[in-house]
A protein has these predicted regions:
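ATP-binding Walker
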Residues: 30
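Walker A/P-loop
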Residues: 33
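NTP-dependent small-molecule kinase module
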Residues: 12-17, 42, 156-170
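P-loop (Walker A) phosphate-binding loop of NTP-binding proteins
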Residues: 27
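A glycine- and Lys/Arg-enriched "phosphate-lid" helix/loop adjacent to the NTP-binding pocket
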Residues: 112-157
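Hydrophobic anchor at the beta1->P-loop junction of P-loop NTPases
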Residues: 24
């Protein structure tokens, strides 16, 4: 990520490994899965994607789970899958954008690992996700103006949770 200088990366990850697990959080389109995979590869750490764990458990895509069973059901499964990462020390876990915001997940992640927030502006998020809004459950039926407005609104709603991250990376 922009804040990651090569000179400090090894030292940074040695500190992080003392915390056992790394939970990468942030809004959709901030690069959580991308950077999680990069950091995991560079530091020989296992990588897990929370949405993939959910899809595996429910045998379906996040979008379909959202549509067929609703957000409340999805958030319950998400919380269960998040807690299933507890035994996996020295792992990097990329979380869905809304994961920190329900079921005391943020508090749980802070107690059981290190939370890193990847930050981005609404414009940066839109640039990163504009080609894939149809696959994003919260955005799929919105036009460009509605998507940007929705991103700003949802970012504001999630801010109090994201602000609890132990490390923030712009």
């Amino acid at each position: 990520h922009k804040a990651f200088g090569v000179a400090t990366q090894d030292e940074f990850f040695e500190k992080i490994k003392m915390k056992k697990k790394i939970y990468i959080i942030g809004f959709m389109g901030t690069g959580k899965s991308y950077w999680g995979k990069v950091w995991a590869k560079n530091h020989q750490m296992p990588f897990m994607d929370l949405d993939s764990l959910i899809e595996e458990k429910e045998k379906g895509k996040v979008l379909d789970i959202f549509e067929q069973k609703g957000e409340e059901f999805f958030r319950e499964v998400e919380a269960d899958c998040l807690r299933s990462t507890l035994p996996f020390d020295n792992s990097i876990i990329a979380c869905g954008g809304g994961a920190p915001c329900s079921h005391n997940n943020m508090e749980w992640m802070n107690e059981n690992g290190l939370t890193i927030l990847l930050e981005a502006t609404p414009a940066e998020v839109f640039e990163n996700i504009k080609k894939e809004t149809r696959s994003r459950p919260l955005l799929k039926d919105k036009n460009e103006g509605e998507v940007i407005f929705f991103i700003e609104k949802l970012m504001n709603e999630r801010k109090s949770f994201y602000d609890q991250a132990q490390i923030k990376m712009p």
